[in-house]
Amino acid sequence: MKFLDEAKVYIRSGDGGNGCVAFRREKFIEFGGPNGGNGGRGGDVVVEAADGLNTLIDYRYQQHFKAQKGVNGMGSDRHGANGKAIVLKVPVGTQIFDEDKETLIHDFTTVGERFVLAEGGNGGFGNAHFKSSTNRAPRHANPGLPGEERWIWLRLKLIADAGLVGLPNAGKSTFLSKVSAAKPKIADYPFTTLHPQLGVVNADGREFVLADIPGLIEGAHEGAGLGDRFLGHVERCRVLLHLIDATCEHAGKAYKTVRGELEAYAETLADKIEIVALNKIDAVEPDELKKQKDRLKRAAKKTPLLISGITGQGVPEALRALAAVIGEAPVSDKAKGAADNAANAEPWAPQDA
């Protein structure tokens, strides 16, 4: 299952059914009177946050959704049936935007949450409705009202308690694979991770969801590398774990590069609680490690944790620091399911809007 976090969709609710013009015709009844029924109501377009989903890939292959039209009224005072609503199922964390991609319509945060995106048109009145003391045989009926139609954008922001950020090849995927059951692709080249990965982490008996976000490079907010499109997935995180590669040229500059991209994306993201860790400490000599630690401490204005995703050194301390910020709230079943599903997702590939 491929990962897709944005899709453009056309929706249309059902038109209302037309009212009917009919008269009662029975033997020995000369003036039967009107008995045309009303038209049925058109179906609604409903969006529902479903459990077990972690991608919008279904909307890559189908972009048009139309609800049923209401059935027309009939004679003998028979009203038309209402049109069947159509339900679009999306992952928890999905946001609905108007066609301008800026106007937020709804944000789904809980499993089972439903939102009526377009209401069906009302059915028209049959001629029986217009019978009065002065008009005993009306010969007109109302047509059904048209349904609503619009283009919308679906945008997914994965729900996680903590997010991993850093430059490409900083060891984020290795860290996630060591602390959870997630199986991200790991290799010794930049941009190995092409889509967000989720893992459920247990630290001191407390569970939380950790998201691995594809690496950022300088100029990501302008589209360089993979761009900053995946940063939306950490907007909901309560804390960020910023990993810096100890084998890089200058740990302080690496830290400032990522911080600059976070600030360029959104001030709220840059203001999140951040835990800084110097990773891959097993791959450098003690003297070089001390230099890198000092550089990072000056840049971050805090003492970084020293960890190694390969050997596990310092990893428990990092997890305890994350858990302390997140608190003791247990992870939801939805988050666990999303993490398991995300671990089996195929690599992300660019998709057309």
Swiss-Prot record:
Gene3D superfamilies: GTP1/OBG domain (2.70.210.12), P-loop containing nucleotide triphosphate hydrolases (3.40.50.300). It comes from the Bacteria. Residues 160-327 form the OBG-type G domain. Its main location: cytoplasm. Mg(2+) binds at residues 173, 193. The keyword Phosphoprotein does not apply. GO terms for cellular component: cytoplasm. GO terms for molecular function: GTP binding; GTPase activity; magnesium ion binding. The keyword Transmembrane helix does not apply. It is an enzyme of class 3 (hydrolase). GTP binds at residues 166-173, 191-195, 212-215, 279-282, 308-310. Disulfide bonds: none annotated. Residues 1-159 form the Obg domain. Keywords: Cytoplasm, GTP-binding, Hydrolase, Magnesium, Metal-binding, Nucleotide-binding. It holds the Pfam family GTP1_OBG. GO terms for biological process: ribosome biogenesis. Its cofactor is Mg(2+). Its EC number is 3.6.5.-. It is found in: Cytoplasm. PANTHER family: DEVELOPMENTALLY REGULATED GTP-BINDING PROTEIN-RELATED, MITOCHONDRIAL RIBOSOME-ASSOCIATED GTPASE 2. Monomer. Belongs to the TRAFAC class OBG-HflX-like GTPase superfamily. OBG GTPase family. This is GTPase Obg. It comes from Rhodopseudomonas palustris (strain HaA2).
